[in-house]
UniProtKB/Swiss-Prot annotation:
SUPFAM superfamilies: F-box domain, Galactose oxidase, central domain
Gene3D superfamilies: 1.20.1280.50, Kelch-type beta propeller
Protein name: Putative F-box protein At1g12855
Signal peptide start and end residues: none
Residue intervals of the F-box domain: 65-110
């Protein structure tokens, strides 16, 4: 017969084996397969990347102690660099060393290069919108307009990849203007208040900037709601670019009644000095005020007001901070009414478009690298789209109105050559297929303020 001692040893062995199996199962459960959205590869990584060892603290009392990962640091970094921004941010709380690595500028720059390459295969759009003024309010009182929603949309699937709501310290009085994306960052400001921010929606980081002199002047001239209604068109949009450092550029027309002030003024924000400065040499042409400047290939571009019946394009070299006038623009653009034309960046190239008032056909031209000639790349014919495809839009905006002189704004080009379109008066965003001449609804948020081509990044604390 089995003695009591043998029975006790047998039970202890079984208990030990059971604990070992549980430990192995627990270790396997801690390892997860994280799918990188950027390149579609499956990366096996541990959320903690640490080995657990136990140090005995007396009989029957053990304390769990974490030891660093056995993987080399450079291997761990390469894994982290290919994870989505949200996953990387979560890893910061697991290790002081990882937090230091992830928050370093070198890591942010390396991650930026990877996501820039992946944007071709996985194009995305950022949608910025206000919250309804009474949503979540107390006592039916309007909530302050300090909340802005940011939603990232996948162009191919039209699905929402992420959404976040950021509350800013100072409100915008429902006059929100946003720049194009620069390395995943946006500049958001208002002319009715002195609010101006640089924000990274992916990391939720933002920085409030001192108001530009132009903002201060506008608030002095138009301090109330009544006076703002009578305001003449002004330049509402900044350009957010990166040379050696990040820059905000604000070009606007001077007071036409005072010729001693010059024709235009240009303010540039220096992030290191935390201050605005004037450029001494500015264009001798007044720029068309109601436009969004386009930035690509190291330059920022603006339309001018018509001179002798002809529109010109001025450009600022963001490295040398010098202005130039393009030698030639498309004749159809040059002789147009400024309200009928638009400028944008598509596939890293400067593009211009014009909408014909009688046919509503909109043609898009791209500037060649020599800057002396243009090529037609797309034609948008919304009137030829079937009425059934147009009837699905319920926001009250008619994309084929004959009296709508402003053209649609191309936001991005999908991999299947479909064109993503927005309009300053529309809340929704549509996708136009030039092959079969059809349109489909992509996204319709409430109180949308801006659509912009976008990719997530870790760049913060600039």
């Amino acid at each position: 017969m089995e003695s009591r001692e043998d029975s006790f040893i047998s039970k202890e062995k079984k208990s030990t084996m059971k604990k070992e199996k549980q430990a192995i199962a627990s270790q396997r459960n801690r390892r997860r397969v994280i799918k990188n959205r950027g390149n579609g590869k499956r990366l096996i990584a541990s959320l903690s990347q640490r080995k657990r060892r136990r140090i005995p603290r007396g009989r029957g009392n053990e304390k769990a102690v974490f030891a660093p990962s056995s993987l080399p640091n450079d291997v761990v970094e390469e894994i982290f660099l290919r994870l989505p921004v949200k996953a990387i941010i979560q890893l910061k709380s697991l290790s002081k060393q990882w937090r230091s690595t992830i928050e370093s500028r070198s890591f942010e720059e390396r991650h930026l290069k990877i996501v820039e390459r992946s944007r071709v295969d996985f194009p995305q759009v950022m949608v910025m919108s206000e919250e309804y003024s009474l949503k979540g309010s107390k006592g039916n009182q309007p909530r302050p307009d300090t909340d802005i929603g940011f939603s990232t949309i996948c162009l191919e699937s039209a699905s929402i990849l992420s959404s976040t709501l950021i509350t800013f310290p100072q409100g915008f009085q429902h006059r929100i203007y946003a720049s194009e994306s620069c390395d995943g960052l946006f500049c958001i400001h208002s002319l009715k208040t002195q609010a101006i921010y640089v924000v990274n929606p992916a990391t939720r980081w933002f920085r409030q900037l001192p108001p530009a002199r132009f903002q201060i002047l506008m608030q002095k001239l138009y301090p109330t709601q009544d006076t703002w209604i009578d305001i003449k068109p002004v330049v509402c949009y900044t350009a957010f670019v990166k040379a050696n450092d990040y820059k905000l550029v604000w070009l606007y027309n001077s007071d036409a009644s005072n010729p001693n002030l010059g024709v235009t003024k240009c303010e540039v924000f220096d992030f290191r000095a935390n201050a605005w400065r004037y450029l001494t040499c500015t264009p001798s042409y007044r720029i068309f005020p109601d436009q969004v400047p386009a930035a690509t290939n190291g330059s920022i571009y603006w339309f001018t007001e018509p001179y002798n019946g002809e529109i010109k394009v001025v450009a600022l070299d963001i490295h040398t901070e010098t202005f130039r006038v393009l030698p030639k623009i498309n004749p159809a653009i040059a002789s147009s009414d400024p309200d009928h034309i638009d400028m944008c960046t598509l596939d890293n190239g400067l593009c211009m478009s014009k909408r014909e008032s009688d046919t509503l056909v909109q043609e898009i031209w791209r500037l060649k690298s020599s800057e002396d000639s243009w090529e037609k790349v797309y034609t948008i014919d919304l009137l030829s789209c079937s009425s059934s495809s147009l009837s699905e839009f319920r926001d009250g905006f008619n994309w084929t109105r004959k009296d709508l002189v402003e053209p649609s704004t191309p936001v991005a080009i999908c991999k299947d050559k479909k064109i993503l379109l927005s309009h300053r008066y529309a809340r929704n965003m549509i996708k136009y297929d030039p092959q079969i001449k059809s349109i489909s609804l992509i996204y319709q948020p409430p109180l949308c303020r801006r659509y912009a081509s976008y990719f997530q990044s870790l760049i913060s604390h600039i």
